Amino acid sequence: MRFIILTVLMIVLTLPSSSFAALDYGKQSLIGADFSGSDLKGATFYLTDLQDANLSDCELQNATLYGAKLKDTNLSNSNLREVTLDSAILDGTDLSNTNLEDSFAYSTQFENVKIQGADFTNVFLPKDIVRKFCESASGTNPFTNRDTRDTLECDYI
């Protein structure tokens, strides 16, 4: 009996499981794609074109958006905690009510970005970007209850 149980257990453990594998959308053109409300934890969007895509209300913790084109992309109400946004292009992107805590945004381009209610806690941003964001920063993140201005440390620049 032990042998049968052990054999079944070994077979189950060696079967591939999509729930354990992160989704890889790297180097794809996903213009206008609708991922709204999706669980995309750990997904890879490396160098992916997500222009006009809907990623609102998504769980994107630990995802990679390195070099992604996020022009006019809706990321509102999403969890982008610990996300890699290095070298990404955010132009007209909606980050309202988004949690970006502990994310990486080195060499990220930000233009005309909506940030009302966004949480930037522990996100290293160049001072010129912080100054630009502080001009329009307002709101409180509904998930972390932190004020956007406080997370950008607007009072200290």
Model-derived segments and their meaning:
Residues 5-6, 11-157:
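Tandem repeat scaffolds
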